[in-house]
Amino acid sequence: MADNVPQIFDRKRLARNRTRAAGLTRNFGTHDFLLRHVGNELRDRIAGVARKFLTGLCLGSSGGIIEAMNSEQPDEGHIVTLYHADLSAYLVPDNGRGLVCDEERLPFAEASFDLVVALWGLHHVNDLPGALIQIRQILKPDGFFLA
């Protein structure tokens, strides 16, 4: 991220708010209609890609919706290994594939992922062009980005 980018959003406050909200809504129950809708849209879009994704990254909380969608996918559009990154530790799984990090400073090596999905987070990024550049860098040359 460039040093001269105006800091419109307070990223530390956003992390606190996401953690608080995650604690209040650990089990969405019948209130996950928006997540399910986004998951269905995501499933349809990824299913249209005629390939299997060996490594995927979900930026922002998915509430488990991507895992549910992925278990229903045939070979095309299937994500073999899915990693999660979020500002809040409460929103990343504790299965060894979750990382607490800021979308503005991605800690991944270049060409690490076949697929990057950004849910519920890029609208709060101060340097959107910088974040998109970083996402492009962590994608493999034929990688797929969906936001």
Please provide the spans of the model-predicted regions.
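Short, functionally important structural connectors and interaction interfaces within domains
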Residues: 1, 6, 26, 79, ...
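Class I SAM-dependent methyltransferase Rossmann-like catalytic core
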Residues: 1-54
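Soluble, non-transmembrane catalytic domains of enzymes that act on hydrophobic metabolites at membranes
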Residues: 10-15, 28, 77-89, 138
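Class I SAM-dependent methyltransferase SAM/SAH-binding core
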Residues: 43-115, 129-133
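Short conserved AdoMet
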Residues: 51, 126, 140
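Short catalytic micro-motifs in class I SAM-dependent methyltransferases
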Residues: 120-123
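A short glycine-rich, Lys/Arg-flanked "PGG" loop and its adjoining helix->strand segment in the class I
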Residues: 129-144
